[in-house]
Structures are given as C-alpha cells and as structure tokens.
Amino acid sequence: MAKPVVAIVGRPNVGKSTLFNRLAGYRISIVEGEPNVTRDRIYADVNWLDRSFIIVDTGGIDPYDRDQIKNMVKYQAQMAIDEASLILFVVDGRNGLTATDEEVAAFLRKSNKKVILVVNKVDDFKNMEEDCWEFYTLGFDKLIPISAEHGKNTGDLLDEIVNMLPEKGPEDSDDDAIDVAIIGKPNVGKSSLVNYIVGQERVIVSDIPGTTRDAIDTLVEKNGHRYNLIDTAGLRKKSRVKEATEYYSALRTIKAIDRSDGVIMMIDALEGVTEQDKKIAGYAHEAGKAIVLAVNKWDLVEKDTHTMENYKEEIYYNLKFLQYAPVTFISALTGKRVQELLKLIEYVVDQNSRRVKTGLLNEVVQESIQLREPPTRKGKKLKIFYTTQVGIKPPTFVFFVNNPGLVHFAYQRYLENSLRDAFGFVGSPIRLKFKQKT
C-alpha cells in the first residue's frame, strides 16, 4: 500500500514552503550528508507517531504575474484534490482572509477530501481567536493556528494529520509478486517497455488502476516469476504550465517508487542523464529501493567497441550516488535485453533483502581496518569495536565506535565499499550508522 499523500495548498506568501520545511524536519528516512544527491525536492517523507506519509509543497508560482497566480492556484488545488488523502489549506493569519483564499476554499469544499485549515503566522497564541475568527467563515471543521517559522503548534498539527489519515491497509495483496516501479522522465519509453513485456508474456491482470489516482499496475508472469509492473506513463495531465506538469509527474513517480520492491530507472540513450533524471533517481536512492539503470533506445545509437563502456562512465559520473546500480542497455521497441532486465531487477531486489551473519561481518570490517586504519581527527583516532546488521530494504549496519564525531565521510565510503566487495549488494543502497559504545 502506498503512503498517503498530504498536499500543502494555498496562495503565494502564506508560508507553504516554510511549513513544508518545518514538517520535513521530522523525517527520518532521508540519509543526510551524502554528496551528489539532489535536494531541491517539492516532496518529503514524514514519520510521526508511527505513521509515515508524504508531504507535497504546491509552491512555485510567480507572485508578479497576476493571471498566472489565479490560474496556478486553481490548478494546484485541483491537483491536490486528485492526488492527496489529506489537504493542508494554508492561510495567512497576519494579513487576514483574501479573495484568493476564498477561491481556493471553493475548490476544496466541492471535493470529498479531508481538509485541515492551517492559519499560519499567528504571533499571539493567547489572542489567537482574534487572528483566526474570520477564517471560520470558509466552512472547514478543522482549524489549527500555527507559526511555521518558529515551530509553534506544529506538533499539534502533525497529531491531527495522523489522526485524519486513512487507516493502514495491507502492504501487498500479491506477496509472491515483485513490485517493480518503472520510472523516468516523460517519453523515455516506460509504456513501450511495459507493452513489450506484456505482449510477450501471459497477462494475469492487465491495466487495472488501483484507483483513479494511482499508477497503472500490470501483473505478468515470466518463467515462473510474477512481476507487478507499476507504470506512471500516460497518467500525467496535460498543462501549458511547465512547473505544474513537473510537479504532477514527480508526485506520480514517488508514489510508484514508494510501494515498489525495486526500481527500473529508464534513461534516454539519445539525451543522456538530465537534471530531471537526477531528481527522480535521487528519490529512489533515498527511499532505499533496489535499482537498475536501463538505458533505452540503444538501437538508435551509433556504436563502436567502446561506446557501451564510455556511456557507463558518463552515467556514473552524472549519478555518482548510484555507482552501486547495474547499467543495462535495452530497446523497449525491439525487446533487446528486456528479458535480461527482468532477471536483473529480480537479482537486485534479492540483494536488497540480504542479511550477513554477524561473525562474518565483523571479520570483514576488522580486515578492512587493518588494510586502512581510520584517519585521526584533531589528534583523536576513531576506534570501531564491532558491527551488526540491523535492517534490510535497504541493508542497514550499525558500527559501535568510541566517538561517532570522528567518522570522516571518506572513511565511511571506504567501509561501504569494503562491504560491497565482500558481500555484493549489487543494485542495493547501503545505510551505515555509527553509535557510541556505552
């Protein structure tokens, strides 16, 4: 089951992005401090009271273009209605109710979606009734005053969000099928890949949308293995506004990634890695999913004996944070290497669930330390006492040390590479945590 989506909606300058950043500060799933992972997201994972959900910021409106503001606020409100389980409608308690607020509210009242009216920029909580009274005329039952900038009352807001989220459902109704998200920018060939696989194999369930808001799932069987292909292609609403289109496409993609076991990240061979590719791949990496990089339209590329290797180097240069992900070169149109791709995604999904025995793990770590001792920092030396694996999907390891502050990023990367050399983890991200031994 995909995580529920909570959309932040409102006119410009009411503090949507500030609220987004405040709520995103509670997330625990993002690995901080890793280089080359694009961070300019419009979405983030949040975990609060044992519930996980995705928050989305519907910002990006030019405040100087009045026509664009009017159209974009409407369009973003409509997208929130389509996509979200819950909507945070943000208004400005300092400046009061405006005609644009009423326009957005009119959209939201017509929907069947749950709405929390968030009155931001409340300075005096003792007299908050005076700051908020006029907003009750908008007709929403739930109203919460906050100061996103200072974090006041945001805990109460998170409590109410969790209270209003839909109940948890089963994680997966097809336990023996591998959920594979096929992601990539528009027109990279996602639908062509699904159509080729479906056309070649026996279709069990084809093109059945989970809901009108979800990606299309196609369940196929190949050589005794079942694959649930999650395709976001063809679902993106057409819009003349580029920013809104990218927002809609990104939200579809992250929902597909979130409920997958593994990800096929498709790259256009004729265009190479783009900035949009980096953003999409970055979320898959941060979400801890097994991943394969599939370079599509390879049949259209002029090749010599070095073309494939040179292309791999270029991909890893642009996606430095995905150097663990295998690269394969396919043609979704002709089917070249598509069967190999299916075997590869199954392999990396298995790698992402791999566990290592504690004794063997510590042998490898100690050998790595002997080969390259940790560098000293400010005259102090890092000591690693022992290591244990604490999780899978992705494989997560805790190193008990004398002082976590002495761990240099370069040495952390060295330890990760040592684990990969010893145990593989092909196509799987690895999480390393360092805790002080008590």
UniProtKB/Swiss-Prot annotation:
Function: GTPase that plays an essential role in the late steps of ribosome biogenesis.
Ranges for domain KH-like: 354-438
A GO BP annotation: ribosome biogenesis
Residues binding GTP 1: 10-17, 57-61, 120-123
GO function term, MF aspect, one: ribosome binding
Summary of subunit composition and partner proteins: Associates with the 50S ribosomal subunit.
Bilayer-crossing regions: none
Protein origin, superkingdom: Bacteria
One Pfam family named in its UniProt record: MMR_HSR1
Species name: Halothermothrix orenii (strain H 168 / OCM 544 / DSM 9562)
The protein's name in its UniProt record: GTPase Der
Binding, GTP 2: 184-191, 231-235, 296-299
UniProt entry tagged with the keyword Nucleotide-binding: yes
Keywords for the protein's UniProt record, in alphabetical order: GTP-binding, Nucleotide-binding, Repeat, Ribosome biogenesis
The keyword Aminoacyl-tRNA synthetase belongs to this UniProt entry's keyword annotation: no
Gene3D superfamilies with a match to the protein in the record: 3.30.300.20, P-loop containing nucleotide triphosphate hydrolases
